[in-house]
Swiss-Prot record:
GO biological process, one term: translation
The entry's keywords: Ribonucleoprotein, Ribosomal protein, RNA-binding, rRNA-binding
Assembly information from the UniProt record: Part of the 30S ribosomal subunit.
Family the UniProt entry places it in: Belongs to the universal ribosomal protein uS17 family.
Entry coiled-coil feature ranges: none
Protein name, per record: Small ribosomal subunit protein uS17
GO MF annotations, alphabetized: rRNA binding; structural constituent of ribosome
Highest classification ranks of the organism: Bacteria, Pseudomonadati, Pseudomonadota, Gammaproteobacteria, Alteromonadales
Annotated organism of origin: Shewanella halifaxensis (strain HAW-EB4)
């Protein structure tokens, strides 16, 4: 295992849960046959201790120990508000 902590940037899709947010991580993947770059989206559940995020915010999250069945990321900062 490496000692670096994984951090990602994404947009908040949902903040309806208590102390939790759903973040959409967008990445570009090259199509194997045609070579065109395609956008792929991954949804990640993250922990938001102060409930400071709203839907549409641009945020930075980092990996942590598992907090629940689906949450293993925590909010680091809100880059821009929606």
């Amino acid at each position: 295992m490496s000692d670096t902590i994984r951090t990602l940037q994404g947009r908040v899709l949902s903040d309806k849960m208590d102390k939790s947010i759903t973040v959409a991580i967008e990445r570009k993947v090259k199509h194997p046959l045609y070579g065109k770059f395609i956008k792929r989206t991954t949804k990640i559940h993250a922990h938001d201790e102060q409930n400071q995020c709203n839907a549409g915010d641009l945020v930075t999250i980092r990996e942590c120990r598992p907090l629940s069945k689906t949450k293993s990321w925590t909010l680091v900062e809100v880059i821009s508000k929606a």
